[in-house]
Amino acid sequence: MSKPDVAQVKAFLLQLQDEICRGLELADGAGHFVEDAWRREGGGGGRTRVLRHGAVIEQGGVNFSHVHGDAMPASATAHRPELAGRRFEAMGVSLVIHPHNPYVPTSHANVRFFIAEKEGEEPIWWFGGGFDLTPFYPFEEDVRHWHQLSRDLCQPFGTDIYPEFKSWCDRYFFLKHRDETRGVGGLFFDDLNRWPFADCFAFMQAVGKGYLDAYLPIVERRKALAYGEREREFQLYRRGRYVEFNLVYDRGTLFGLQTGGRTESILMSMPPLARWEYDWQPSAGSPEALLYSDYLKPREWL
């Protein structure tokens, strides 16, 4: 295996954060990201950037973090006892965009790198990440575009990669207590070290760079569509599922809180507004009902 180049990964992630913020600001047309640079007492720090009350984006955050320490947290060593007693570095870019317009889907992306080292032993490293889409209203062409781009960026790495990571995404972003997916999926991968370092890094870069190509055309298509109170209420209700997933299931949230990560940055993914309603059911034949019947379960889109 080729030797991991931590500095190269960090440089890419910082540049990626800049590029994504620039692209989202252009798509929004009015809002700007405000940066909050922070340091972690145990080692490391990051740049949290938040855009609020934009023309398109109600609230969005793009976070870069790089944390390191002398010992792994319990959440990481529970499944990987070989990591115990190793110093570690974890770095990544994660983002969530919550648009105003209910016809524009919420999107999430994350790319990350992890390495654990011990004197006299080979380092243990891997990449993880992916992106996923959470529409509130069903537009099949948007979902097909999202998945087509996902498949295209996986293609150079093998024809089996898209089906594998697409399926992983469907399984990961699943709310067991609701028996529904969080959205329509995309790609999800973790523990990626099956190829030499350079190839694994290239795949992570392709996913990171692919996010804007996947999301911005959908934003452009939907951001000017007229909507009313009914659509807004449904959007806020569905955002409740986003909150449920992030607080109950998301491994990144758990890891961040257990490593003494920065709470404001970890919970940046939360929507600014959400609502719950007891035993709400969609009307038969409505677009909302179609979302439930055809979109909130794993399916082949291509």
Swiss-Prot record:
Q: Which UniProt keywords apply?
A: Cytoplasm, Heme biosynthesis, Metal-binding, Oxidoreductase, Porphyrin biosynthesis
Active site per the UniProt annotation: 108
The pathway to which it is assigned is: Porphyrin-containing compound metabolism; protoporphyrin-IX biosynthesis; protoporphyrinogen-IX from coproporphyrinogen-III (O2 route): step 1/1
Q: List the disulfide bonds.
A: none
The protein's site described by Important for dimerization is found at: 177
- Enumerate the Gene Ontology biological process terms: protoporphyrinogen IX biosynthetic process
The annotated region (Important for dimerization) lies at: 242-277
Question: Which cellular compartments is it found in?
Answer: Cytoplasm
Name the positions where a divalent metal cation binds.
98, 108, 147, 177
Name of the protein in question: Oxygen-dependent coproporphyrinogen-III oxidase
